[in-house]
A protein has these predicted regions:
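Glycine-rich phosphate/diphosphate-binding loop of Rossmann-like nucleotide-binding domains
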Residues: 61-137
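Anion-binding alpha/beta catalytic cores of soluble intermediary-metabolism enzymes, centered on
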Residues: 14-82
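Conserved residues at the C-terminal ends of beta-strands
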Residues: 18, 86, 180
Length: 200
């Protein structure tokens, strides 16, 4: 309810919606009751529109922003590079693609209907994988010289955390790859803390 959002507006400098919500609640209504200027995880339609239009409406989504921070930290210039994002969710895939475009990369988004995905991914200089399936990207997708950012967080058959990229097969081939755990997830937490406390 927007009245709840307005009522909290003067009290709280930042707003974060914890999910999943109870099933009886309408997630879209609740997300859009947040104030875009205080929505630290880009849940509102207004916040997300800022990502797609290039206008600074509220805050960027934390996980795609973490991917950009990793590229920046290691001095990886995206200008003119071919980038592939595996996954088209509104949480990671689509916003990550838009952020890469803003960095002047030439971006392709792969998804479950992509034909010959390994060949498409192999052409990329930068690969962001947010497919939501453990080890879906293996050595057949990759080549030397690539930078791979693995956003996935899964539990394998042994009960261990793993990413969407088969790390053991990928790591010897590519130039650089983020591990799971200890990669994007850790940076996402740092990005969230930075956004949550900025100008608060």
């Amino acid at each position: 309810d927007r009245s709840v959002s307005r009522g909290l507006g003067d009290v709280y400098k930042r707003q974060l919606l914890f999910r999943p919500l109870p099933k009886h609640l309408n997630q879209s209504v609740i997300e859009n009751a947040l104030d875009p200027a205080k929505d630290v995880d880009c849940m509102t339609d207004g916040s997300m529109s800022g990502v797609f239009t290039g206008k600074n409406v509220g805050f960027p989504p934390c996980t795609p922003q973490a991917c950009m921070e990793i590229l920046d930290h290691y001095g990886i210039d995206c200008t003119g590079k071919k980038a592939v994002v595996v996954g088209r969710s509104l949480v990671v895939g689509k916003p990550a693609a838009m952020m890469l475009i803003k960095k002047n990369a030439t971006v392709t988004v792969c998804h479950t209907r992509t034909v010959d995905m390994p060949s498409v991914v192999k052409e990329a200089d930068i690969v962001i994988v947010a497919a939501g399936r453990a080890g879906v990207v293996d050595d057949t997708y990759l080549r030397e010289g690539q930078v791979v950012i693995d956003v996935g967080i899964n539990v394998n058959e042994e009960g261990k955390l793993c990413g969407d990229v088969d790390f053991e097969k990928a790591e010897p081939i590519v130039e650089a790859i983020t591990p799971v755990p200890g990669g994007v997830g850790s940076v996402t937490t740092s990005v969230f803390c930075l956004l949550y406390t900025s100008d608060a």
